[in-house]
């Protein structure tokens, strides 16, 4: 029997009972009957459920920690179905909230892997748009810790969105949500079936005046309008009681104004103009992502297989101020277009060799073509009589740098789930990965997890994972740096080594205890040893991050969690202590000042996204009030503060921003009356109830761009009708 530690949200305070730590069921596979297509809705439900169980048995999370939110849990939180994925995941244990919609799991920068029904969807070009809409999911899970061998590449966490299954009733819903900062968010879903074919579609639109975090503490940002569109479609055809084919895909389009920070000081003269109001800048960025997956699944007795070809196209465009205002402040501007086209295939399988051994295996291949085109305007420079560098003319020069790269990722894994006893499971294996792009590297990565359940409700786990994380392909070639010598875009550092893959030793252990009356508590501890630690920073006007490496690094942390679910009440809470440090920047050195390189070359420093303490809590109560159900919800988020410049000006990232606590409140009335009231839901939410003014970033630190403040208090309301 397989017992797996799936740790959920801790101290669960207002998400429903399904947002909790769970234990993965044993990976036994049902023996199918005659291979023929089901001929009734009931047969479809049973077959789909069994195929889902078989798919989950292919990709279990043995020995890792998993935070799971069901559809009910996603709906029963402040914001409900209209909450974005970042806000949902920020409530998970050990997750740090950052600017630009980013989160850091266990103090790692990005390094998150997104999957739909277990199939990897390649990451989009780094920006701040949200590719996935939680409303498409029947459940959302975050997997962390020492991952089994089937999980490679991005390994700080795996976010898996599982779509609904079974025979879809014909119906759907339509809703509208809006409020402060001119928020308008209509959405709709449609689902149904015809014969053995099920379909589901979702669409949403979001407009508000807080597309990117406000660089000032004011209630409303200047020049911060966003328009975002998301579409998703899913079709599944059950071919027989042992096989099905599923096709799904989506589109995310985001248009963002870059918010302005008034009162900035001009430093250059453009065409005789040396003054410009920084509140009037007009910089914009658009992000487009399209993805699709076709998955064939076979579940026949002891053998389960899934093969899934996929594609993803992502594009980011940045447009500077058309009047050249940013040139007057910075001495240059960039108009950029970055694109990435990915085709690949993922195949996974499991075979139950004996009662004690389940063998899992798989391959992965991805081909990516990236293109970059950056047109820069800048001033030529000269020196004055005192030897100071000054602009030689107020007329700009132009240079376009275009590059392209085709790269590949290869992966293969094999592992064995060995049931040593009914209470003790040992999962061990290895994977081989190779990258052929800006860097040519490969690694064999052993993985091992031991899970022990000495008694009902008690689970211990300990694990080790060797990880290999290739850098993203949107890299800057060193040749571009030299082309800007003698201009206002000249870099102080004239060289940059290529970005390398990160290599990591990961150790993790923990225990989970299920107590009486629905209370579960757990603790998890980890330690990581890193070579070529990957980090990313914002080094230009565009809000696209660029990667670089520290030669060495390490991270450690401890997570405490608890949740309570009993009847109508669900509560959770988490607290985590952790940190990450790196030493000696060994790639993309042209992004940094010489004094930074000198200090970091001889000292460990905190990475800019390292936060000592994080915490979250929340809960919900379901009240049957005669009209249906009344569901008040609340949650809070605590951050100890991300890194900033050293107040003494000595240690990079040697300072820290002030800590903060924000709380959100919501209440929803779900009607269950006759006629139009059937399926009707209305809700009201308050974000940042105390109107806490807090900085996520202050604009200082290694690779940090402009200041960013958290959202001020906002009031929102919504209505949704299910049909």
Question: Where are the model-predicted features located?
Answer:
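Membrane-embedded beta-barrel scaffold of Gram-negative outer-membrane proteins
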Residues: 295-318, 453, 460, 497-549, ...
């Amino acid at each position: 029997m397989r017992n797996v530690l799936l740790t959920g949200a801790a101290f669960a305070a207002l998400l429903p009972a399904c947002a909790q730590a769970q234990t993965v069921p044993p990976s036994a596979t049902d023996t199918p009957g005659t291979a023929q297509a089901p001929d009734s809705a009931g047969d479809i439900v049973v077959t789909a459920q069994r195929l889902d169980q078989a798919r989950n048995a292919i990709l279990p999370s043995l020995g890792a920690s998993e935070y799971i939110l069901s559809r009910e849990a996603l709906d029963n939180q402040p914001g409900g179905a209209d909450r974005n994925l970042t806000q949902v995941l920020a409530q998970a244990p050990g997750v740090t909230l950052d600017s630009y919609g980013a989160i850091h799991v266990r103090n790692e920068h990005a390094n998150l892997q997104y999957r739909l029904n277990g199939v990897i969807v390649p990451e989009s070009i780094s920006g701040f748009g949200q590719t996935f809409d939680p409303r498409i999911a029947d459940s959302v899970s975050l997997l962390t810790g020492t991952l089994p061998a089937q999980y490679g590449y991005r390994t700080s966490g795996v976010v898996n969105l599982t779509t609904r299954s079974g025979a879809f009733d014909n119906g759907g819903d339509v809703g509208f949500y809006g409020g402060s900062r001119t928020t308008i968010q209509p959405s709709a879903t449609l689902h149904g079936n015809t014969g053995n074919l099920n379909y589901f579609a979702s669409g949403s639109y979001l407009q508000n005046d807080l597309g990117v975090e406000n660089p000032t503490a004011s209630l409303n940002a200047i020049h911060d309008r966003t328009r975002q569109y998301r579409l998703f479609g899913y079709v599944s055809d059950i071919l027989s009681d042992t096989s099905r084919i599923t096709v799904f895909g989506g589109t995310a389009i985001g248009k963002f104004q870059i918010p302005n920070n008034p009162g900035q000081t001009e430093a250059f003269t453009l065409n005789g103009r040396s003054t410009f109001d920084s509140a009037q800048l007009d910089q914009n960025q658009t992000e487009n992502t399209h993805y699709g997956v076709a998955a064939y699944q076979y579940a026949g007795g002891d053998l389960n297989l899934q093969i899934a070809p996929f594609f993803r196209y992502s594009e980011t465009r940045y447009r500077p101020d058309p009047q050249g205002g940013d040139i007057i402040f910075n001495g240059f501007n960039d108009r950029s277009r970055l694109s990435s086209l990915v085709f690949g295939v993922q195949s996974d399988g499991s075979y139950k060799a004996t009662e004690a051994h389940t063998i899992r295996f798989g391959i992965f291949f991805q081909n990516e073509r990236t293109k970059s085109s950056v047109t820069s305007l800048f001033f030529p420079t000269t020196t004055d009589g005192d030897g100071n560098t000054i602009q030689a003319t107020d007329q700009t020069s132009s240079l376009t740098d275009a590059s392209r790269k085709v790269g590949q990722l290869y992966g293969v894994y094999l592992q064995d789930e060995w049931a040593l006893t009914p209470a003790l499971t040992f999962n061990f294996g290895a994977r081989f990965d190779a990258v052929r792009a800006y860097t040519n590297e490969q690694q064999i990565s052993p993985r091992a997890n031991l899970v022990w359940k000495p008694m009902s409700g008690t689970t211990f786990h300990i694990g080790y994972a060797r990880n290999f994380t290739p850098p993203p392909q949107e890299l800057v070639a060193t040749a571009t740096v030299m082309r800007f010598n003698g201009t206002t875009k000249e870099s102080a550092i004239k060289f940059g080594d290529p970005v390398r893959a990160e290599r990591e030793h990961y150790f993790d252990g923990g225990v989970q205890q299920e107590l009486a009356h629905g209370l579960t508590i757990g603790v998890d501890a980890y330690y990581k040893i890193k070579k070529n630690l990957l980090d990313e920073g914002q080094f230009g006007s565009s809000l696209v991050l660029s990667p670089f490496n520290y030669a060495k690094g390490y991270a450690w942390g401890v997570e405490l969690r608890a949740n309570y679910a009993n009847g109508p009440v669900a509560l959770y809470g988490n607290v985590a202590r952790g940190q990450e440090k790196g030493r000696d920047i060994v790639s993309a050195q042209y992004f940094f000042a010489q004094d930074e390189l000198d200090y970091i070359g001889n000292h460990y420093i905190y990475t800019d996204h390292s936060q000592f303490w994080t915490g979250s809590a929340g809960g919900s109560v379901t009240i049957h009030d005669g009209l249906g159900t009344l569901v008040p919800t609340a949650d809070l988020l605590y951050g100890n503060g991300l890194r900033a410049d050293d107040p003494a000006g000595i240690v990079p990232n040697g300072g820290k921003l002030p800590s903060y606590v924000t709380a959100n409140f919501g209440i929803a009335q779900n009607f269950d009356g006759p006629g139009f009231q059937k399926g009707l839901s209305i809700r009201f939410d308050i974000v940042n109830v105390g109107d806490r003014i807090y900085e996520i970033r202050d604009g200082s630190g290694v690779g940090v761009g402009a200041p960013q403040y958290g959202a001020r208090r906002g009031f929102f309301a919504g209505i949704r009708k299910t049909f």
